[in-house]
Swiss-Prot record:
InterPro entries: PRA-CH, PRib_AMP_CycHydrolase_dom, PRib_AMP_CycHydrolase_sf. This is Phosphoribosyl-AMP cyclohydrolase. Pathway: Amino-acid biosynthesis; L-histidine biosynthesis; L-histidine from 5-phospho-alpha-D-ribose 1-diphosphate: step 3/9. GO terms for biological process: L-histidine biosynthetic process. Its main location: cytoplasm. It comes from Clostridium botulinum (strain Hall / ATCC 3502 / NCTC 13319 / Type A). Belongs to the PRA-CH family. Its EC number is 3.5.4.19. It comes from the Bacteria. One of its GO terms (molecular function) is phosphoribosyl-AMP cyclohydrolase activity.
């Protein structure tokens, strides 16, 4: 499937051009992080086979692992039933979280 066909399946309008993207470990199923993608970051993710996101605070694209070396290699990309959320299954090199934890979801509330 080409990039145009993929982009047409995704509703970027609901979130002002951004869609929440869940990153999950391909082998274990562990949820590693949540980030946001725009159309350009999704295209770069598909082209490079590594995850790219839109930083809402810095207002720029970023390639996960470009600074730390903790790249996420894309194994599969899934879309939810409403077309407004992505699930990307990855092979994670090193920790996913900037704190050094494997997952960003390391704090238990209940």
């Amino acid at each position: 499937m080409n990039l145009q066909k993929i982009s047409k399946k995704i509703d970027f309008k609901k979130g002002a051009g951004l869609i929440p993207t869940i990153i999950q470990d391909f082998c274990s199923g562990e949820v590693l992080m949540l980030a946001y993608m725009n159309k350009e970051s999704l295209e770069k993710t598909i082209e490079t086979n590594t995850t790219w996101f839109w930083s809402r605070s810095r207002e720029e694209l970023w390639n996960k692992g470009a600074t730390s070396g903790h790249f996420q290699y894309v194994k599969s990309i899934h879309i939810d039933c409403d077309g407004d959320t992505l699930l990307i299954k990855v092979e994670q090199l090193g920790p996913a979280c900037h704190t050094g934890n494997r997952s960003c979801f390391y704090t238990t509330l209940i």
